[in-house]
Design a protein with these regions (language model features):
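Non-catalytic interaction/targeting regions
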Residues: 1-185
Length: 185
């Protein structure tokens, strides 16, 4: 590798391994905990392997893949996070995004047949305008709507949930300072 080819490259200090020894008053550690990490070309962590106490049955591996939104230069939003051990997967989350890179849905797999779905909607300014939580025991989904100021599209004005509860906010736009908050409490 020549220095010319490295001149315009991007670098970051990547933690590739971490080891912690627990000495408990002894000269040698009675317990050691090690973790290894790996990264993609954008510096996103794609692998975390936790060796626990050194027992092969305790090893947990988290693998993460990311959305690649080249036009927006967004590479850090996870697409899937998978936690596995010796017996298979323990946790799984998938993430959907819109063309702007906003997260529109997360799916948390509680088992192969059970999925908890959160959905999100955004306005053209990238502000969150609706969040809907997973179904409860009765199939109901708690939702929240968010209203933003009409002038700057920066300041949250109101949050309302599907039960009819709401909170209202007022700001001093000169300083971005919250001046009033009112809710049912």
């Amino acid at each position: 590798v020549s220095l010319e080819s490295l001149e315009n490259a991007t670098y970051f200090p990547a933690l590739v391994s971490q080891s912690t020894g627990y000495y408990e008053g002894q000269e040698t550690p009675g317990l050691e905990h090690r973790m290894d990490f790996d990264y993609d070309v954008h510096g996103n962590q794609i692998l975390e392997r936790d060796y626990g106490n050194g027992n092969p049955e305790d090893v947990l591996t988290t693998t993460t893949s990311y959305h690649n939104l080249d036009d927006q230069h967004i590479y850090s939003v996870p697409e899937e996070i998978l936690l596995t051990d010796d017996n298979g997967w323990l946790r799984r989350r998938t993430v959907s995004v819109d063309d702007a890179g906003n997260i529109t849905e997360t799916r948390d797999y509680l088992s192969q047949d059970s999925v908890a779905v959160n959905t999100y909607a955004f306005d053209k300014y990238g502000n969150l305008i609706e969040a809907i939580r997973p179904e409860n025991l009765h199939g109901d989904r708690l939702s929240f709507t968010y209203q933003w100021d009409a002038d700057l599209h920066t300041y949250l004005q109101e949050v309302r949930d599907s039960y009819g509860n709401h909170s209202a906010y007022e700001y001093d736009p000169r300083f971005g300072e919250l001046t009033l908050r009112s809710d049912m409490n």
